[in-house]
Amino acid sequence: MSTKSPLKPLVFTHNFEGNKRRIGVEIEMSGLGVDELAQIVAKHFNLTVKTDGRYERLLKGDAAGDWKVELDFDLLKRWGRQERLGDSFMDELDASLEKTLKTLSEQIVPLELVSPPIEMDRLVEVESLVEQLTKAGAEGTSDRWRNAFGMQFNPEMPSLDSQMIVRFLKAFLCLYDWLEKRADINLTRKITSYVDPFPRAYVLKVIAPDYWPNQDQLIDDYLSYNPTRNRALDMLPLFRFLDESRVLAIADDVLIKSRPTLHYRLPDSEIGQPSWGIHQAWNDWLEVEKLVFDSARLDRVCEAYQIFLAHPIERFVNNWDELVVTFLAEDR
């Protein structure tokens, strides 16, 4: 019987289209081969495995869409989709280079399991899958010093209104220190800059009581301070969905996927640890959503955080991640 905490329910139950909200889940790991991982996932969800190159597998049969298992290395994936006939010098050279790169990458590049957008109540199925993968030998960030593996959530927005988006940003920025402490991010991931915190100047701008920009200004401000995917809460997929040309003019990165979701990148993947699952990161994320839902409490938190950031002595004496707990307790 699992001793993990239950996955708490949503506050915002429906998406911007009025349907049940969905979420995409991405989990990085090592310790298993592409085919081994694909077969375990396929068996768990009763799916069919299709080969999509030497380093990618598509798992078909889920009404929500295709699951994907892939090596998280774009160059190798592109090479893996090319047929090697071996009847020319260039084919042989490419094959040799690919083999060398594959051998080197296996030491540091994770496999990634990517779900389709699934309804939130199916997260329990993902939690059960994590337990199976752990038993099968999957390894996460703390299993090897060089592992810098993450788990990412892509929850659909309950509304695409600019004010709602700003509320999510305000809530996340106010709770970032608390979330980061709770997540206990591995030093290797911190060094790699995959989940850099937001610049202090941007934080101060967003949490100001009069910061309620329209969509164009919101996106422009974000791009001015954050022209990168490497943020704990990456807004670029959502902003590309809303205004592709505006985003690509500043952050033209092929890895920015256009989708009406937030992209929460902070948590480590500690798959392989028996007590680990998606429950803690999910339940902590819901504190952001609860704060978004409660506008009056959000205003109070923003005001308190502004005061804290404006006083160096306060920052020296106290830690914001401890002070903000008082506001979280109001919802208990």
Q: Which residues fall in each region the model found?
A:
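Structured core elements
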Residues: 152-154, 263
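C-terminal accessory/tail domains of diverse enzymes
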Residues: 2-111, 117-128, 135, 160, ...
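Catalytic palm subdomain of template-directed nucleic-acid polymerases
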Residues: 156-158
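Active-site palm subdomain of RNA-directed nucleic acid polymerases
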Residues: 135-144
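Short, conserved phosphate-binding/catalytic loop or strand-edge motifs used
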Residues: 145-152
